[in-house]
Amino acid sequence: MAAKDVKFGDSARKKMLVGVNVLADAVKATLGPKGRNVVLAKSFGAPTITKDGVSVAKEIELKDAFENMGAQLVKEVASKANDAAGDGTTTATVLAQAIVNEGLKAVAAGMNPMDLKRGIDKATAAVVAELKNLSKPCADSKAIAQVGTISANSDDSIGNIIAEAMEKVGKEGVITVEEGSGLENELSVVEGMQFDRGYLSPYFVNKPDTMVAELEGPLLLLVDKKISNIRELLPVLEAVAKAGRPLLIVAEDVEGEALATLVVNNMRGIVKVAAVKAPGFGDRRKAMLQDIAVLTGGQVISEEIGLSLETATLEHLGNAKRVILSKENTTIIDGAGADTEIEARVKQIRAQIEETSSDYDREKLQERLAKLAGGVAVIKVGAGTEVEMKEKKARVEDALHATRAAVEEGVVPGGGVALVRALAAIVDLKGENEDQNVGIALLRRAVEAPLRQITANAGDEPSVVADKVKQGSGNFGYNAATGEYGDMIEMGILDPAKVTRSALQAAASIGGLMITTEAMIADAPSEAPAGGGMPDMGGMGGMGGMM
């Protein structure tokens, strides 16, 4: 096992503090409407320019192992805030830096670190409760657009497109962000349920100009196995032909003789039919087939529940107003499923979202939920260059998380004002002893840090602005973008309450851990032996020694 380097007490904390400050100083430059840019060198390709705090934090690794530990712990603050609310990472970093710097001063002055931590925790709980009281519900799309704009570093085109997307697909709908091909941002909304499987044969196409197959008022046959034998399908095909309606077959696969017969029947006009593979794989495929069944009021023909293709009747088939199949996608519009059953299915998926611990599973479940409950909106981000595209896409994703958080827990005045107003909750708060009181006072100073940093980045005097904001009340604050004072909500400067709360909780949690650190252990740097000369390369036919 490699030798370890161990540091204790003050010398350990000093090293850690250096790392904390290096990372936080780089990240906090991006805070606020006048946040500065940070340039990141890449091992290949052009450097990236960003105003996104997380991107900056991710790039930082320090040479000294102990300093690096401090930097990585602050990175943890940012990712904790990001996991909880999807935004607020820079605010969380600024708060953590303030708490750690003040806290370590107090520890160096002889305070008890455990009591300091208890004081910080007590004050944090009071501020979080006060933030809940300050928050106002975020109902209309104007407020949603304002939240999106602030989070996207004051880019109102991003705020507006997110508000429009939310209006179209509802609060439950899925909004995905993709790289577009033009210079402008575009929004496209998919109504109904869309899944990423296209027609199995181009001979099903009935609109050659757009290369799509459209079925009006079709019946849907949902099967969870491969269909290769046409004899299994005959009873259903005959019943559908008698009913005189088109048919969409969604199965694990349709191949060989079965597919050929369907194509021939379709081309001769005997039965208007199209076939498509079921979406997903394994258990997820079964679940998605069941979703389609619930949406269209049909049943999945599965041997697991004792149904086979030969015994299937029209009652087992789903109904929809229209189905559109392209080469890549299938869209089912206006399924005829019962509302009560769809609601029950939505409830079931929501319960699974709550239980799952995997981010991938959660994302897939949310997609399924949106397809049943709302719709899917796709924001295509437009930009002039690859570098700008990446940076803009990261900002759109941040803004999207922020607006979701705003809808969930409401909004508070932005620009660091909400934290200053929440100070009212800890003005008279007292701990059980003097050291806890120092912890409470320490947090009282730390919560001003975001407001001071936003002001400093805008080139103004932090102390003057902080004092003036503290003298005001309610939503009165400082608009760093214009240099004016006024009502933050009226000026459209809002933060989601959830983002502010998560940032403070993450910062207090990691800050408390750092203050109570007593020892640090890292791999000892390996002593590389001094490089000697090359050995004599004798023995190579007459080449004595190579000089």
From Swiss-Prot:
GO cellular component, one term: cytoplasm
CDD domains named among the record's database cross-references: GroEL
This protein's UniProt keywords: ATP-binding, Chaperone, Cytoplasm, Isomerase, Nucleotide-binding
Catalytic activity: ATP + H2O + a folded polypeptide = ADP + phosphate + an unfolded polypeptide
Residue ranges that the Swiss-Prot or TrEMBL entry lists as coiled coil: none
GO MF annotation: an example: isomerase activity
InterPro entries: Chaperonin_Cpn60_CS (IPR018370), Cpn60/GroEL (IPR001844), Cpn60/GroEL/TCP-1 (IPR002423), GroEL-like_apical_dom_sf (IPR027409), GROEL-like_equatorial_sf (IPR027413), TCP-1-like_intermed_sf (IPR027410)
Main location: cytoplasm
EC number assigned by the record: 5.6.1.7
Enzyme class: isomerase
Subcellular location: Cytoplasm
Protein origin, superkingdom: Bacteria
Keyword Nucleotide-binding carried by entry: yes
Chain sites annotated for binding ATP: 30-33, 51, 87-91, 415, 479-481, 495
PROSITE patterns in UniProt: CHAPERONINS_CPN60 (PS00296)
Any one GO BP annotation for this protein: protein refolding
Family: Belongs to the chaperonin (HSP60) family.
SUBUNIT field: Forms a cylinder of 14 subunits composed of two heptameric rings stacked back-to-back. Interacts with the co-chaperonin GroES.
Record function comment: Together with its co-chaperonin GroES, plays an essential role in assisting protein folding. The GroEL-GroES system forms a nano-cage that allows encapsulation of the non-native substrate proteins and provides a physical environment optimized to promote and accelerate protein folding.
PANTHER family linked: 60 KDA HEAT SHOCK PROTEIN, MITOCHONDRIAL
Name recorded for this polypeptide: Chaperonin GroEL
Organism, scientific name: Pseudomonas putida (strain GB-1)
